[in-house]
Amino acid sequence: RLQILSHKKSRFVFMKRIEIIKKAFLVLLVLPFLNTGCKSSSEEDFPSYIDAKKLRIFAREEVSTSFLNNVGEAYEEMFNDNSNIDSTMRSRYLSTSQDEYVYQRVGVDGMANNSNFDSGEPPLPYHGNVTDYIWEKNSADDGQIGEVIEHLLHTVTNVVFYLAYPNDWDYNDSYSAISLAMHEAIDKGIYDVSSYDDLKDDNDLYNKITTQEYAYWLILAEWNYFGITDKSMDGMSGNEEFIIGTPEEIDAQLPLGHQLYKDYVEKVLSIPNKQKIVSLF
């Protein structure tokens, strides 16, 4: 059993390293356009798209129509009504997403492995307000639910929350709510950021990705979604990078993180119905 756990741990670390490289690569492709202006855009890069809750979701040519539509449905599942929703905050979130032309990209798994991969640029006015890709997997058993939920939440927190609530979601402000909550988890040994050490030479990129991943793990735990996304390791509610994975543990051990969730996430998003998500992917 120790050998099995060691193998799973090694595989988790290996897959995490690959994921970090992909994230950094995609972010670095976007940053020059933010600083110097957009390259010539073409609808050929993203020949199809859908709109879901004021978010435009662009797809590369290879993406299946059914998968693109299901990604949109998964996002809409996060916006069901419940008694915790603050209508003013949700309205601000949605209007920011629309007015700032936030978008999500969808591609096919393996595309970014090509050394000549071009992340593409959607038609104007969509430009810059984006984070990473959602990849359509070859098999539903290959972590597809986790892939979709993770990268939608990256867009929610790292792009829309950052734009709509800059004081609390500014990842470059060490005193912002997101930064303080993340460091609470790091200081308590709950969030291990050592796998991101290679990014430290670029402070903006390091802050962007570490807070993005923290917010994702936090929400995943608050939603009790570690199981459905296949992100928990044997003998743990969480995993090697984020060791707790239930709302009760977040409440008990990460008061700043739990408050951040209560103040923003819970007031804007609903927990997606698990049966619905499973039916989509």
Where are each of the predicted segments found?
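Short, Lys/Arg-enriched N-terminal segments with co-localized hydrophobic residues
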Residues: 1-14
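Bacterial N-terminal signal peptides that target proteins for export
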Residues: 16-25
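Hydrophobic alpha-helical targeting segments used for export or membrane insertion
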Residues: 26-30
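Bacterial Sec-dependent N-terminal signal peptides
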Residues: 31-47
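Acidic/His-rich structured neighborhood in mature extracellular/periplasmic domains
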Residues: 45, 52-189
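Conserved aromatic-histidine-acidic binding/catalytic patches
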Residues: 59-63, 140-144, 200-212, 231, ...
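Post-HExxH zinc-binding segment in Zn-dependent metallohydrolases
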Residues: 160-231, 237-239
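Pan-zinc metallopeptidase signature
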Residues: 218-281
